[in-house]
Amino acid sequence: MERGLWRAGSVPGHVRLAFGRTGEGPEPLLALHGITAQHRAFNAVARHLRHPDGMVALDLRGRGDSEKPPPGNYGLDAHARDAIRTLDHLGLERGILVGHSMGAFVALQAALLHPDRVRALVLLDGGWPRPEEASDADEAAIQEGLERAFGRLDMVFETPEDYLDFWFPDQNLTLEDLPPDLADYYFYDLARVDGGFVPKAFREAAEEDAGSVFSESPTAAELEGVGCPVALVRAAEGFFPGTDPLISDEARDVMAQALDLRSERLLSEANHYTMLLLEEYARQTASVIRDFLRRLG
């Protein structure tokens, strides 16, 4: 199901990284997806954004069509190095990084470790400060949300429609029933194997990365070391409808104090996933990014 939005490319090296690219310009945005996703999560945002230089959306190591090294090769530092390696491959001295969910933490880590290489950051419902002492309730809420996403990674689905039934139970959907951007996202998420289809994301990679986010992401004090301009887009709901947002108002205030926050928006009816995957919210997300880029000049 190739829709023509992305041109496939790869970053060579000790871990080969796959990416999709839109546009032809010399300074594309670099987009980094969430913990079990892949670059097609940015389908709708990239299409609505129409950035003049385009977008390069990476399949993080262990996801999509990128290589999947064994456990011990993941974590925020490894992904941040991959982001910089991608900038090198693209010939970009300094890049604008757009990160959703875990991708936002990767973008922050890249800005902290390589401040001379990151011009600006767009954080999409991720990158909140790691508390000095995490509460059991907060960790449990995030773990509960991740469990559903992680659970599918060990499953074999007889058909793509069975995969849709996992996400949309009892709706009997086919790929043709979904908006094209969303259908393409779910189809690309699958690899064909004997007996059916499996999600491309490597579970051990996701688990290692979750541990890295919980234990190694920046604290509020460390966020103050990010020297570049930042845009923040938050979803009003968490992983599921009716759940608390992942970035609370209190966490947002801490981020606003620590970071050079130039643009922000709260998507009032979106959740952590729909802010990218559903048309109406992806359009709003793209609008914030466009406004932020205009302000950067």
What is each stretch, according to the model?
Residues 12-22:
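A short loop-to-beta-strand scaffold at the N-terminal edge of the catalytic core in hydrolase folds
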Residues 20-68:
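Conserved HGGG/HGGXW glycine-rich cap/lid loop of the alpha/beta-hydrolase fold
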Residues 56, 60-98, 270:
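Active-site loop/oxyanion-hole signature of alpha/beta-hydrolase fold enzymes
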Residues 93-136:
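Conserved hydrolase catalytic core segment
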Residues 131-200, 206-217:
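Helix-rich cap/lid subdomain of alpha/beta-hydrolase
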Residues 191-258:
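Conserved serine/cysteine hydrolase catalytic core
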Residues 256-269:
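Catalytic histidine neighborhood in serine/cysteine hydrolases
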Residues 267-280:
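Catalytic histidine-centered segment of alpha/beta-hydrolase-like enzymes
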